[in-house]
């Protein structure tokens, strides 16, 4: 049901309920109608819309729920505004109200799609509000792995979903460029620069083993220049003994590499925030001092502890260790203070499920500052791990990364790159990258974040209905082909289809497809509210299924103009909604396959 129709029907039902309540209790009786909840019945034969308001109000109004439902239905159908919307009403069971919409109400979605085009499904109800989404936020110590890829897909699609509701969305990447890992990166690069490799005597125990370290060392020695998108160019000094220079070059090199990974994945960020800046600007010290002054800390065993149990944590947590260094959640608290100070009253973090333990600590620290930050700030979407399968075997290693599969590997493999090509990316064409990006983005968003995901490379390469992204894209391409043939054979352009006689669309398959199209706006609203980007992928698979059912049941290219143009109009509307949904996922909508 279209949102406008839903709002109208909710208002009509609320008015009908009020009429019945006053008839039962008296016109002067105080009564406020409850929020009307409309749902689609699980069984199509029960109607198009179901409502349980009679069950809710029977006891307060002192009447039988079924009799109450009958009175509500009588009041509803008597209202002139309901005539073009409600075709029939039935009472089921103890008092459920089942409504059937008129054919015109169901067909109205086609006109709405034609009128709104790319904007169909979007809303401006949240215009003027802003949301910060932080995701990926990898250490600049290696290429992005498949876990980062899942974060990138979840974060980018969720950002698109939230933006569809009118929010101004700010995408942010937090670089953990301070700490032990960065030191390990520097000594790894230094060892490679000295000619050592993993397994050699003298190879540092904490060093990273991926081939990318050798690439960094080579470019450092060759005095190459690298730069991240938001950073100053850094030129390799070539000095093997200058560990600080090696560190700066290695971080810049890997940030640039991660930029390239994200570009291949179709993800753009509005801002990159460096953890190191929290220290250089004194924000970590300032945050700790504020918590001490607020009485939220105490000293024990030479360490500074935060009273996180005051905010529901299972035990207090160390903030500053006895050696004077901070535990990892302390800069996170300082970082989130900056988010609040920048005016972001709604913040969503996409992180791996292994970060679950930090949530209570960060929130406790923010509450302890007493600066007006609400409880439950920030929101979190936690995701589980990704397992990569190829040729029926789990893939655990990558030549590029050494100990894990990278996002770039996944894109190239899913695009059909031949084994060995990933070592020579110049051999991989843009079409391969596009196919791979489409598959990876769709696959990684096609399960709920809190479920583990098995990424099957072989499935991603299949060109049949088993492959979900192919299934959806093929539906779009098939419609494009039909509409091209419509123009070629009958000289009917899509621009002429809004004038089609939609009363021709009466088959069960046509009605079901129209109903699925009408669900798109509410699906986006629900996905934004519940932080559930997977809902878009679920919807598109269902929509493609409804299209295929319709297309297999009814011929579109027939000589009879009225049914032909009506069916073509339905296909054109379906194509538009497929395009809109795929755009939210950041997946292409090919006209040919």
Swiss-Prot record:
For this UniProt record, the keywords arranged alphabetically read as follows: Aminoacyl-tRNA synthetase, ATP-binding, Cytoplasm, Ligase, Nucleotide-binding, Protein biosynthesis
Motif 'HIGH' region: where in chain: 138-148
UniProt cross-references to InterPro entries, sorted A to Z:
aa-tRNA-synth_I_CS, Arg-tRNA-ligase, Arg-tRNA-synth_N, Arg-tRNA-synth_N_sf, ArgRS_core, DALR_anticod-bd, Rossmann-like_a/b/a_fold, tRNAsynth_Ia_anticodon-bd
Q: What class of enzyme is it?
A: ligase
Question: Has the keyword Protein biosynthesis been applied to this entry?
Answer: yes
Cite a single GO MF annotation: ATP binding
Specify the species: Burkholderia ambifaria (strain ATCC BAA-244 / DSM 16087 / CCUG 44356 / LMG 19182 / AMMD)
Q: Which PANTHER family match?
A: ARGININE--TRNA LIGASE, CYTOPLASMIC (PTHR11956:SF5), ARGINYL-TRNA SYNTHETASE (PTHR11956)
GO CC list: cytoplasm
Q: What is its EC number?
A: 6.1.1.19
Question: Coiled-coil segments, which residues?
Answer: none
* Family recorded in the similarity comment: Belongs to the class-I aminoacyl-tRNA synthetase family.
Q: What are the BP-aspect GO terms? A: arginyl-tRNA aminoacylation
* Protein name per UniProt: Arginine--tRNA ligase
Q: What does the record give as the organism's lineage?
A: Bacteria, Pseudomonadati, Pseudomonadota, Betaproteobacteria, Burkholderiales
Task: Give the primary localization class.
Answer: cytoplasm
Keyword set includes Iron: no
Compartments in which it is found:
Cytoplasm
Q: Which reaction does it catalyse?
A: tRNA(Arg) + L-arginine + ATP = L-arginyl-tRNA(Arg) + AMP + diphosphate
The record's section on SUPFAM superfamilies has:
Anticodon-binding domain of a subclass of class I aminoacyl-tRNA synthetases, Arginyl-tRNA synthetase (ArgRS), N-terminal 'additional' domain, Nucleotidylyl transferase
User: What SMART domains does this protein's entry cite?
Assistant: Arg_tRNA_synt_N (SM01016), DALR_1 (SM00836)
Assembly and oligomerization: Monomer.
Question: What highest taxon heads this organism's lineage?
Answer: Bacteria
